[in-house]
Amino acid sequence: GNALEVTSTGFQLKSTSSGFNGSSASYVYMAIRRGPLAAPTDATKVFHVNQQNNADTFSVGFPTDLALVAKTGGSSSNAVVGSRLTGDDKFLVTSGTDAEASSSSIFTFDLQNSFKQGFSTSAENVSWLWGRAPSYFDCICYSGTGSNRTVSHNLGAVPEMMWIKCRSNTDNWAVFHKDTGATKVIFLNNDIAASTLSTRFNDTAPTSSVFTVGTDAEVNGSGRTYIAYLFASVDGVSKVGSYTGNGASTQTIDCGFSSGARFVLLKRTDATDEWYVFDSVWGIVSGNDPFLTMNTTNA
């Protein structure tokens, strides 16, 4: 088995071998932080969108840490999520509560500047890919305790949006957003409004070093395993925000970008509605732009 596993803040020894982790033995080590050491200034270095047919390898320009892939034609299909941390054959579906599943080579993350998705369907697929970078995006795995606790992260900024999913068991995707606050949770796999539930984030906003989870099994069940995706705003690169609708045919939301948005995810929080995704591959141009929904199988 693996002797060492990378964590969000360093590494974890997974062996009792005297060469790595002997009882009361002394060791020295050197470790170098992965990835960029500064917040990104160019979105193309940390985010990529691509549309392709069937299984395909394509250039990304950076190591992919999070992949969100959806079928855009043909019969209905779930959008699926994979990460470098959990490996090439593991995935979660965004429209359901299923535990993490396996499928041989559904993703290939071990490529320096490319990515491969292994879907073998006759329909086109769209891939949205993130690379970890300070103040922009981080991805961590942790184990639940069943008691209120904090979880360390390496985002280097206060997370403004978090997606948390239990990997080991069936349960909802719990979403934190800075503008709905830590007293409420939104469910990525559901269309319901933001719900006031203190057992998800223990009514405690995240900080630049930790986020808090409550006692609910969706985020912190004893003996369960979880993955958390953390997002924050970087001027000119990414924006996490909110707005109030005006009911008119036109409303402009200023994200501070100089060349427009390539990806937009939005969800109504005060009433029932879907999680909508728009992107530049399909064309963010007019009010009739096509979209996908994260919480349904109707891509």
Where are these predicted regions, by residue range?
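Surface-exposed molecular-recognition determinants
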Residues: 1-299
